Swiss-Prot record:
Lineage, highest ranks first: Eukaryota, Metazoa, Chordata, Craniata, Vertebrata
Name the UniProt record assigns to this protein: Pterin-4-alpha-carbinolamine dehydratase 2
CC per GO annotation: mitochondrion; nucleus
Annotated positions of the N6-acetyllysine modification: 120, 124, 131
Family statement: Belongs to the pterin-4-alpha-carbinolamine dehydratase family.
Gene name tied to this protein: Pcbd2
An example Gene Ontology biological process: tetrahydrobiopterin biosynthetic process
NAD in keyword set: no
Amino acid sequence: MVAAAAVAVAAVGARSAGRWLAALRSPGASRAAMSSDAQWLTAEERDQLIPGLKAAGWSELSERDAIYKEFSFKNFNQAFGFMSRVALQAEKMNHHPEWFNVYNKVQITLTSHDCGGLTKRDVKLAQFIEKAAASL
C-alpha cells in the first residue's frame, strides 16, 4: 500500500498529493463529503437523463458504466481550444474526463471513478461539453 501511494504521489504531483493521501487515509470522510452528484444514477435518473445525451450523440459503453462521444473540429487549434475549455470546467468540478486527441478529433469517456459508474457529475460535464462544442 505504501509503495502504491508513493507511485500515486509521483503520478499526481506534489500539489494534488496532499488531497489524495488525505482521502486514502480516511475514505469514510471523503465519501461523506461527496455531494449527491457523486452517487450512482438511479434507474429513474438514467431514464430521465441519458436519452438526451444519446440524442446528442453520446453512447453508453457496454463494457463499463460510462458514456462516450467523439467530436470533430476544423483543425487541431479548434480541438485544443475545446479541450482547454473542458479542462477548466472539469477542474472547477473536480471531475476529469478520460480523453484522447489526434489532430482535429477528440474522444471523450465520462465515468466517476470514485463511485465506479455514471453519476450526475458525468451528466453535468457532458452537458457542458455539448455547449462548449456547439460554441465553436
